Amino acid sequence: RLGELTKNNTKCMLEVNGVRLIDRYLRQLSKYSLDRIVIVVGYEGQKLIDYIHANYSDINIEFVNNPIYDKTNNIYSLALAKDYLCADDTILMESDLIVEDGIIDKLLNHTDKDLALVAKYEQWMDGTMVRIDDNRRILQFIPKAGFRYEEADDYYKTVNIYKFSREFSSKQYIPFLEAYCKVMGNNEYYEQVLSVLTLLQNTTLRALPIGNEKWYEIDDVQDLDIASTLFSEDKNRFQLYHKRYGGFWRFPKLLDFCYLVNPFFPNKRMRDEIRNNFDILLESYPSGMGVNSLLAGKYFGIKQDYVVVGNGAAELIKVVMEEHTNGRVGVIFPTFDEYPN
């Protein structure tokens, strides 16, 4: 899904604002007293190994190779590293994540030994969700196919960072993982095993919700673009937001005080009417220019001949400026720069 960006390299070699994901991870993890870092490699694995050997000889890093990475999924990759999980307490992290330092601090400093980091659902999130109770017990893992928008307010997204104790791995997780692979095959996800464990009353795994800490999962070029904005330097972030000219729903925590909005529009009545007619609006083909001009004239009380309906102000501005002006023209200058651009 990342196309040319991963044509010759694995995902963790992607750069976000000039820093590779693997470099960021290793810098973050090197602050802690870890016995070792274990990396499961597959696609273009030797390039990653060579890069790490050349740059991180001072860190104890071991590698596990998945030679059939193109025929298996992450459940098999994790199974290959099962001996490491059973030998020590483990932090499990996926390589396509970018997180701020505080998230790892929060995980390691928590007194619970077995944790799954989760984040309250936001619209940009995709993939496996969970439900949790007031005691942070995971009640249910919800795969992507089982997602229900009407229940989204109850969901938390798995961040795909976990803390497993040696006891949990050896006595609960790995035995179930091995059995799951035998029954379901190797082209599955390791979270499905965690889903089975939630059915057991005595599992020690708990969820740990994060707060406003920044994180992002990079699966495609749009994710990379958004992550580059979120994790940019303070001095550059405003310009990166500004050049988007909108679409700020992709940044739920961003408050935009400059965009030309009317806090009284649309009102509740209009929202309810749109919701009630949504299926018709979505499935039916819209009317042409003639009908739209007629309706606009009707609602504004003017002749149809005096109305031109366009797809937003930018479309009409272009026509007016190029074809219907002579000499000097004076215009207002809105904050989102649609006239000069």
Predicted regions and their residues:
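Conserved core of the sugar-phosphate nucleotidyltransferase
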Residues: E100-M184
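Conserved alpha/beta core of the MobA/IspD/sugar-nucleotide pyrophosphorylase nucleotidyltransferase superfamily
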Residues: Y155-K243, W249-K253
